[in-house]
C-alpha cells in the first residue's frame, strides 16, 4: 500500500512538471523576417530632422507614449549634467533610453510587440506602427553609445538574458538568428536570472550598448541589444523546465528595411552591414562558420540554417 501511494505521488508530480513545461509556449529562434529592423544607414541626419514632429504626432495619438516621454524628459533634464556622452548624442536619444527602461509601465512591451510584427511590409509599418520616432531615437542611441566598428573596434560584451514566459529553442546548432526586438540583458548573471528562467541566454554581443548610466534602474547593469544583430547558435541544452541558449555575435547586422519612413521598401533579403562601415553595405557574402549563404545581389544576403 505504501509503495502504491508513493508511485501515485510520483506520477502526479511528473504530470505536474510536464504540465508546467508544456504551459510555457515554445518559439523557434530564427532570423524573424517580420521584424521591423531599420538601422537608418545613411539617412540618420534626415530622420533627425523629421523625428521631432513625428514624435509629437505619435504622442497625440498614444497617451502612454506621451506620459512616458514627458516623465523621462523631466528626469533627463535633472540628470543630464552628470553624464559623459558621445558626440552627436542628443537629449531625444537619452530620453528614448529612459522611456524604454521604465518597466513600471507597459510601453517597452508594446514597442517590442510592434517591432516583432511591424516589418511584414512597408505599408504595414507606415499605417500601423505607432512608435516610429521612438524606434528611431532608441536605435540611434544604441549606435552612438556603442560606437562604430562592433567587435572590430573593441571586444564584445558577454551578457546574460532571462525570459520568464517563453521557451526559445533553435532548430539546430550553427543556425543564424536574430533576437528580433530590443533585447535587455545584463553583465550580471544574477540580475538576469531575476527576470526569468524559462529561457536563459548566454550571449556575446558586438552591437549591444551599455545603458546603465541612462537607465531608470542602473543597478540592473543593462546592455541593450538591437533587433538587427546576427548571432550564431553555439550551444543549447535543457535543464528541466529551462532552456539554456548560447549565442555568439557574428559582428554583423542585417536588415530588411533601411530608411523606411523616407521611402525605403522592404528588401527580399536581409542586407548585411559590415562592422566598421555603418554607412555602407557589404558586397560580400557573410562568412558564416556553420551555415549557408545565398548571394542574391550586391549587398543582399539570405541567411539560411546550417546543415545539409
Curated annotation (Swiss-Prot):
CC per GO annotation: extracellular region; membrane
SUPFAM superfamilies: ADP-ribosylation (SSF56399)
Glycosylation sites: 102, 197, 251
Disulfide bridge positions per record: 43-259
InterPro entries according to UniProt: ADP-ribosyltransferase_ARG (IPR050999), ART (IPR000768)
Secretion signal, residue range per the UniProt entry: 1-23
Main location: secreted
Organism domain of life: Eukaryota
Residues annotated as binding NAD(+): 100, 161, 181, 215
Subcellular location: Secreted; Membrane
Alphabetic keyword roster: Disulfide bond, Glycoprotein, Glycosyltransferase, Membrane, NAD, NADP, Nucleotidyltransferase, Secreted, Signal, Transferase
GO molecular function, a single term: NAD+-protein-arginine ADP-ribosyltransferase activity
Catalytic activity: L-arginyl-[protein] + NAD(+) = N(omega)-(ADP-D-ribosyl)-L-arginyl-[protein] + nicotinamide + H(+)
EC number(s) from the headed UniProt entry: 2.4.2.31
Active site per database record: 161, 184, 222
Alphabetical list of Gene3D superfamilies matching this protein: Toxin ADP-ribosyltransferase, Chain A, domain 1
Residue stretches making up the TR mART core domain: 63-253
Protein family per UniProt: Belongs to the Arg-specific ADP-ribosyltransferase family.
Protein name as it appears in the record: Ecto-ADP-ribosyltransferase 5
Species classification: Eukaryota, Metazoa, Chordata, Craniata, Vertebrata
Gene: Art5
